[in-house]
């Protein structure tokens, strides 16, 4: 059954999920900042989040009947999956370092430079050139981040560098995750779980060597400070939920609408952090933040205009869908992990009617991307 998700019920679902996404994301950032203020171990906070992804995803994804893993050829696994896990690890650690060193509002303003990194990296890795309009749309982003940096009262060089490295890492993940999803048709949530497990496996020895002894000597751990432990637990759960909700929103709307929603989310996070954490800002600093976010919206609009075709706005997303229940009656070769339809390169092809809810098939022309932010 084909159709456009244009009804008022669908609009209400999208708006409700976006609101939930904004609240979860802002809560995650505020709690993360509170944790790092009292427990200054960004590597340990990263470890908790990776553990959360690893521990919660398997049982819940099975409960939700998310399609099982597909076989990925070992050479492909080492060539793309392992580097993706390393990139996720680097981006997560540096993101927490930036959150530790600078205010949430400034860290998220710097993260507005992601389109700049995306343009540069796609040119470096794939030789992809952008139209002049797209390059021009980057100027407000650069200008806004520059103004915010110069006027940031709590500026820290390590915080700035870490935020930039983190943004570059997330941008690389977005680019190469799209390739993995296209090549393997692995469910996007299963890819999140796979990267979380692999990142944890790589990171655990490093954490044991660099952070574990200092952590166990910290007063919060020695004295079993339940407030810090509860904040760490909440941070891990909220980070996991944020990823799940972000991917769910992406499945319901067009890529352009998702990009606009993501930019709006950043505004919400900045506003909430300023309200709750109360870090001092000047009006010029606010102008810089606003200009950077507006630049992101201009970039998204420029990308839309240069595609040469109209994209629907919220939440018109041309989507193929089938009735969810009963799942057992559907002839889905991936149900409960069965696999067929191998491609010539050893990877798998997803049936055309496979859902994002119980498969990862997206209609042709519908871009799918992971956003680990």
Swiss-Prot record:
Claim: Cytoplasm is one of the keywords in the record: no
Organism: Drosophila melanogaster
Chief location of this protein within or outside the cell: membrane
Cited Pfam families: TPT
InterPro entries reported for this sequence: Sugar_P_trans_dom, TPT_transporter
Signal peptide: none
Protein's job: Putative transporter.
Cellular component GO terms, alphabetical: Golgi apparatus; membrane
Domain of life from the UniProt record: Eukaryota
Coiled-coil ranges from the UniProt annotation: none
Transmembrane segments: 11-31, 41-61, 80-100, 104-126, 133-153, 157-177, 196-216, 228-248, 256-276, 282-299
Protein name stated in the entry: Solute carrier family 35 member E1 homolog
Protein family (similarity comment): Belongs to the TPT transporter family. SLC35E subfamily.
Keyword set, alphabetical order: Membrane, Transmembrane, Transmembrane helix
One BP term from GO: transmembrane transport
Membrane topology type: Multi-pass membrane protein
UniProt subcellular location: Membrane
Lineage: Eukaryota, Metazoa, Ecdysozoa, Arthropoda, Hexapoda
């Amino acid at each position: 059954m084909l159709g456009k998700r244009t009804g008022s019920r669908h609009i209400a679902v999208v708006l409700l999920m976006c609101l939930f996404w904004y609240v979860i994301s802002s809560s995650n950032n505020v709690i993360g900042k509170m944790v790092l203020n009292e427990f200054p171990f960004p590597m340990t906070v990263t470890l908790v989040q990776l553990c959360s992804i690893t521990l919660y995803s398997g049982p819940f994804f099975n409960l939700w009947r998310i399609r099982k893993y597909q076989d990925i050829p070992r050479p492909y696994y080492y060539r793309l999956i392992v580097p993706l896990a390393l990139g996720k690890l680097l981006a997560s650690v540096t993101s927490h370092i930036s959150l530790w060193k600078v205010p949430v509002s400034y860290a998220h303003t710097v993260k507005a430079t992601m389109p700049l990194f995306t343009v540069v990296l796609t040119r470096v890795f794939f030789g992809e050139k952008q139209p002049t309009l797209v390059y021009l749309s980057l100027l407000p982003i650069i200008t806004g981040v520059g103004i915010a940096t110069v006027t940031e009262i709590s500026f820290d060089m390590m915080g700035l560098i870490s935020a930039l490295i983190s943004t570059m890492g997330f941008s690389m993940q977005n680019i190469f995750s799209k390739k993995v999803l296209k090549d393997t048709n692995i469910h996007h949530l299963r890819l999140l779980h796979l990267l979380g497990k692999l990142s944890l496996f790589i990171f655990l020895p490093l954490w044991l060597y660099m952070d574990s002894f200092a952590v166990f000597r910290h007063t919060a751990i020695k004295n079993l400070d339940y407030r810090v432990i509860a904040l760490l637990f909440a941070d891990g759960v909220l980070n996991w939920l944020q990823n799940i909700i972000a991917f769910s929103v992406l499945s319901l709307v067009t890529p352009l609408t998702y990009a606009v929603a993501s930019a709006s989310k950043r505004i919400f996070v900045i506003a909430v952090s300023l309200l709750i954490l109360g870090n001092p800002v000047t009006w010029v600093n606010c102008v810089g933040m606003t200009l950077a976010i507006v630049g992101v919206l201009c970039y998204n609009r420029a990308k839309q205009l240069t595609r040469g075709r109209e994209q629907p706005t919220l939440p018109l997303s041309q989507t193929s869908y089938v009735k969810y229940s009963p799942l057992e009656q559907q002839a889905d070769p991936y149900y409960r992990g069965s696999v067929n339809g191998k491609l010539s390169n050893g990877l798998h092809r997803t049936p055309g009617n496979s859902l994002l809810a119980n498969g990862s098939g997206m209609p042709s022309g519908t871009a799918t991307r992971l956003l680990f932010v």
